[in-house]
């Protein structure tokens, strides 16, 4: 029988981002308890030799699996060293690859307090309304007028440590033009 290949979209990331992601996930699973129901799988619990960790995030009847890899083909720069992340959405027997922004949006829909379009209706019904969003990485579009008004009223408080963002984990830092300065410290040059 011939070899069968399976192609998986893997976002090339810095190994320090993977360490930060893992520590943030563990903190919010075990210390702050904001990531209830999340499951962390260590590298020694996986059958695949290139998988360094897995985070299973339940979303009602579906699951989001964020899998980090090591020992992949080395990148263009020294610090990339073959580390990557894949994001998979599973529901029963169906699974598909998704991008980091969609993953953040899905996490935002099911976890963490947020001021949303339904907040005015909740306030009229006498329910508690959260005036801020705990997971701003999940907002990938311009907010509603009510959300923007609430944001202007409430001063944002920085969360320490921040909530884990898949978009931040898989952010492309290498292809952005680097800002450099000439010998007189004038920001006239752009990557040259």
UniProtKB/Swiss-Prot annotation:
**Which residues does the annotation say bind Zn(2+)?**
108, 114, 133, 139
Which regions are flagged for Basic and acidic residues bias?
A: 169-186
The biological process GO terms on file are:
viral life cycle
Where is the motif named BC-box-like motif mapped on this chain?
Answer: 144-153
Q: What induces it?
A: Expressed late during infection in a Rev-dependent manner.
Q: How does it sit in the membrane?
A: Peripheral membrane protein
Segments of this protein annotated with the region Interaction with host APOBEC3F and APOBEC3G: 54-72
Q: Where is this region: SOCS box-like?
A: 151-180
Residue ranges of the region described as Interaction with host APOBEC3F? 14-17, 74-79
Region Interaction with host APOBEC3G: start-end pairs: 40-44
Question: Modified residue Phosphothreonine is at which positions?
Answer: 96, 155, 188
Q: Please provide the record's free-text comment about the domains of this protein.
A: The BC-like-box motif mediates the interaction with elongin BC complex. The HCCH motif (H-x(5)-C-x(18)-C-x(5)-H) mediates the interaction with CUL5.
Q: Which HAMAP family match?
A: HIV_VIF (MF_04081)
Return the protein name.
Answer: Virion infectivity factor
Q: What is the lineage of its organism?
A: Viruses, Riboviria, Pararnavirae, Artverviricota, Revtraviricetes
Gene this protein is translated from: vif
